[in-house]
A protein has these predicted regions:
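Outer-membrane beta-barrel proteins
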Residues: 2-8, 18-236
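Repetitive helical segments and hydrophobic/amphipathic motifs
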Residues: 12-15
């Protein structure tokens, strides 16, 4: 699950890093972009059709604040807005993400945080990139989490192992993801379940001598739900 107006970006930067005059301009890193995807697949789940997914990130000395969104061409697709505060050093990374996904015709209010009414989901992540392999663990710790077999908060979790490689002139990434215990948050997770097995290929397409367009294609399979997805995307 998983970009802001110029004014919002400025407020985010100021809140995180303090006065701009106190920080040298070349020490702050910022990026903005968007993906156009033929379908919205996330951790082995179908979350929508053709979507525009903008993002913006501001970082300083390993600390970062990012916003990400998704709006589907189909009006019945959820509208999503996520905020992530993270820190990384070397191969280590940790973050907290606030997911906010508004279902079609729902009246969910963004600043509604009351228990049993909010649609926010708060997730903690910790991981390490060893180079050949990256391992990440994610756990929902608050908000609209799923439930376990007893009807209690599941603290829904997900572990992902990914390995990048090159083949045939393309950049590839193979990954496998699983849920360690039962939760209604992930499709058909009745216990430990491998819910995402996928491979992504990406390449920069040359448009002109000075402009390239990153493109990617992802094939994924969810053994738990016996679902498969094939997504194509362009990054700007």
């Amino acid at each position: 699950m998983r970009r802001l107006t110029k004014a919002s970006a400025m407020l985010m930067s100021a809140a995180l890093f303090g006065s701009a005059s106190a920080i040298a301009q070349d020490e702050v890193e910022a990026s903005v972009g968007a993906d156009l995807v033929s379908g919205y697949e996330w951790r082995g789940q179908d979350l929508g059709g053709f979507s525009v997914q903008p993002s913006i990130t501001v970082g300083y000395k390993g600390l970062s604040l990012g916003a990400w969104g998704s709006v589907g061409l189909d009006k019945e697709d959820n509208k999503e807005f996520d905020l992530t505060l993270g820190y990384s050093t070397g191969g280590f990374s940790a973050s907290v993400t606030d997911y906010w996904s508004l279902p079609y015709q729902a009246e969910g209010k963004y600043f509604q945080y009351e228990a049993h009414k909010t649609i926010h989901v708060f997730e903690a992540q910790v991981g390490y990139d060893f180079g050949p392999v990256a391992v990440n663990w994610y756990t929902n710790f608050a908000g609209a989490d799923g439930s376990n077999d007893d009807g209690d908060r599941a603290y829904s979790s997900y572990i992902n192992i990914a390995a990048p490689f090159k083949l045939g002139g393309l950049d590839w990434k193979a990954e496998i993801g699983a849920t360690p215990w039962a939760t209604t948050f992930y499709t058909d997770a009745n216990g430990f379940a491998v819910c995402n097995f996928g491979v992504t290929a990406s390449k920069d397409i040359k448009v002109t001598d000075s402009f390239t367009l990153p493109a990617f294609a992802k094939l994924s399979f969810n053994p738990a739900s016996e679902s498969t997805y094939f997504v194509f995307g362009l990054s700007f």
